[in-house]
């Protein structure tokens, strides 16, 4: 995903797990091997080595994974295989539009990091629950959020 800040293009690298939760977000000025390494190292340090890694067909991912010696876990084959990652950009885009864009790379990085955590907390996937269970889960999430903010 890219974002323009003062006419310059910046890229948001996002890692999403199999359930659609945002694991990590990194903002860079380029889409190259160095940027891919930055994201992958953060993920490996925090979550360990995954079973498979699904990406788009950007060559930077393959180069970074070869350097980290995890290229055997890389999966780019299959139609629509990375839809979960692509769809994770939509809530961020909506907030970006509401905030009338970003003006600094630093504020974009802070926002992307925080937005992923907050979205994961409140994203209840209401199509999986009955209305009553959804309301209970949402109320519990809101109570937990208020407790965190009260500290």
What are these regions (language model features)?
Residues 25-47:
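Active-site beta-loop-alpha junctions of metal-dependent nucleic acid enzymes
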Residues 69-79:
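Short hydrophobic/aromatic-enriched beta-strand-loop microsegments
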């Amino acid at each position: 995903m890219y974002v323009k800040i003062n006419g310059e293009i910046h890229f948001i690298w996002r890692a999403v797990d199999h359930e659609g939760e945002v694991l990590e977000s990194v903002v860079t000025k380029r889409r190259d091997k160095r940027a891919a390494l930055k994201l992958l190292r953060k993920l490996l340090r925090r979550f360990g080595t995954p079973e498979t890694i699904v990406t788009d067909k950007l060559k930077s991912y393959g180069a970074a994974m070869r350097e980290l010696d995890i290229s055997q876990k890389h999966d780019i084959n299959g139609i629509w295989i990375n839809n979960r990652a692509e769809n994770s950009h939509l809530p961020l885009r909506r907030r970006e539009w509401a905030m009338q864009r970003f003006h600094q790379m630093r504020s974009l990085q802070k926002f992307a990091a925080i937005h992923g955590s907050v979205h994961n907390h409140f994203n209840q996937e209401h199509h999986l629950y009955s209305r009553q269970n959804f309301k209970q889960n949402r109320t519990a999430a809101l109570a937990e959020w208020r407790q965190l903010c009260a500290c």
